[in-house]
C-alpha cells in the first residue's frame, strides 16, 4: 500500500467514525425523547403529535430499508 493510499484510508476511516459518532448521538437523543413520549401531553389532543410521529417513523423506516435493502431498495 502506498503512503497516499494509506493516508486516504486513514482519512476515510476518520470521516466514517466521526459520522458514526454523530449518528449514535442522534439515536441516543431520539431514544431519550421516545422514553419521554416525545414530550406529548396526554391531557391534550394528540393529533399533531401523532402526525409528526408518523412522518418521523416513515423517515426512519426508509433509512432502515436502505441499510437492510428492503422494499424499494431490495436487490
Question: What residues fall within each predicted segment?
Answer:
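N-terminal acidic leader/helix
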Residues: 2-35
Amino acid at each position: 500500500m502506498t503512503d497516499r493510499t494509506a493516508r486516504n484510508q486513514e482519512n476515510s476511516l476518520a470521516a466514517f467514525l466521526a459520522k458514526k459518532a454523530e449518528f449514535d448521538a442522534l439515536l441516543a437523543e431520539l431514544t431519550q425523547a421516545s422514553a419521554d413520549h416525545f414530550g406529548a401531553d396526554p391531557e391534550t389532543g394528540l393529533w399533531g403529535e401523532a402526525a409528526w410521529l408518523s412522518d418521523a417513523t416513515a423517515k426512519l423506516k426508509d433509512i432502515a430499508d436502505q441499510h437492510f435493502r428492503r422494499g424499494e431498495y431490495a436487490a
